[in-house]
């Protein structure tokens, strides 16, 4: 299944264009966490020696297309969240996550369901599409009428239907079964994990479908 969008370029909302951050703030914060993230060389990156803070969009999304690029340091780990609420203390208590990972140097590589591109701890990617450390990886996430796709470096690697019996069964067998807020909504904030070490993001844009 491939979604084709006919929307214009003007429909894109640039959350980060290499110079400015727009429409992003800290999780459970009113402002952008300047002490935890900085803009450098056209990238939005964490400051690892500072307290990590996750980012979320000011707006919420249900049917959307998200595009961005990421890279990590060796052994790095991060994540891209969607359908997030701010009811819990942490974003991962409510939001499903596309895993961002060094598939060579991080222990989460040992399980496919926690490797790069996975619907974290639920749906494994169909193939390993991660570029070598030091190179950026292109991501696309599409959500349309609860059908969700994860794309990495031009390949669709995850596809599922949010709220389906299959996904609910996977959740029931995972650690998320003990989290009452997890994946209860199919509309929410998009987020970026900032408390797992150094990560670089760039060219972050989203549009509603």
Question: Locations of the language-model features?
Answer:
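Bacterial N-terminal signal peptides
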Residues: 1-2
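Carbohydrate-interacting regions of secretory-pathway proteins
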Residues: 6-209
């Amino acid at each position: 299944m491939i979604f084709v969008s006919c929307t214009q370029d003007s429909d894109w909302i640039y959350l980060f264009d290499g110079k400015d951050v727009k429409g992003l703030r800290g999780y459970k914060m009113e402002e952008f966490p300047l002490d935890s993230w900085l803009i450098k060389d056209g990238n939005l990156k964490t400051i690892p020696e500072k307290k990590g803070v996750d980012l979320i969009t000011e707006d919420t999304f249900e049917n959307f297309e998200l595009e961005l690029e990421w890279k990590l340091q060796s052994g790095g780990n991060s994540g891209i969240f969607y359908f997030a609420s701010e009811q819990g203390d942490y974003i991962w208590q409510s939001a499903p996550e596309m895993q961002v990972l060094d598939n060579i140097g991080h222990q989460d590589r040992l399980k496919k369901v926690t490797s790069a591109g996975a619907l974290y701890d639920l749906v494994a990617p169909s193939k390993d599409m991660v570029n070598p450390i030091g190179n950026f990886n292109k991501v696309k996430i599409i959500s349309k009428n609860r059908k969700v796709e994860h794309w990495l470096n031009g390949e669709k690697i995850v596809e599922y239907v949010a709220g389906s019996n299959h996904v609910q069964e996977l959740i029931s067998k995972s650690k998320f079964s003990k989290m009452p807020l997890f994946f209860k909504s199919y509309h929410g904030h998009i987020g970026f994990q900032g408390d797992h070490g150094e990560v670089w993001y760039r060219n972050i844009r989203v549009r509603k479908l």
